[in-house]
Amino acid sequence: MMQPKKTKFRKAHKGRIHGVASSGATLAFGQFGLKAMEPDRVTARQIEAARRALTRHMKRAGRVWIRVFPDLPVSKKPAEVRMGSGKGSPELWVARVKPGRVMFEIDGVSNQIAREALLLAAAKLPIKTRFVERIAE
């Protein structure tokens, strides 16, 4: 699973996701992509599950690019622990995803296989997504 090798701080504030994606909103590498339509936090496990669904359906043909990285630690207190006594320890890593962000890109497969594979990957994610393809120049 994906997580940073080293971070400046062990714990992070929750924060909010405002606005739409300005960077990473267009296809940069592949021919087809999966674009986020709503804001949310996507965990490293969800990204990995989507990647596995993609590669399995493509039968390891073509190439996959993951355009989001879980760089935000989410802390959690153990079960049945009273309030107070500090913030919990980091439990998982998430990526903040804004609407319009291209999350996955694929290339080297047909339109039909790409659409099916990205639809399977979208089922593993907690947000609404849209299939996008590069317009032929």
From Swiss-Prot:
Any GO BP annotation: translation
Protein keywords: Ribonucleoprotein, Ribosomal protein, RNA-binding, rRNA-binding, tRNA-binding
GO CC, any one term: cytosolic large ribosomal subunit
GO MF term list: rRNA binding; structural constituent of ribosome; tRNA binding
InterPro entries, A to Z: Ribosomal_uL16, Ribosomal_uL16_bact-type, Ribosomal_uL16_CS, Ribosomal_uL16_dom, Ribosomal_uL16_sf
Biological function: Binds 23S rRNA and is also seen to make contacts with the A and possibly P site tRNAs.
Subunit structure: Part of the 50S ribosomal subunit.
Cross-referenced PANTHER family: 50S/60S RIBOSOMAL PROTEIN L16 (PTHR12220), LARGE RIBOSOMAL SUBUNIT PROTEIN UL16M (PTHR12220:SF13)
Similarity section: Belongs to the universal ribosomal protein uL16 family.
Record's protein name: Large ribosomal subunit protein uL16
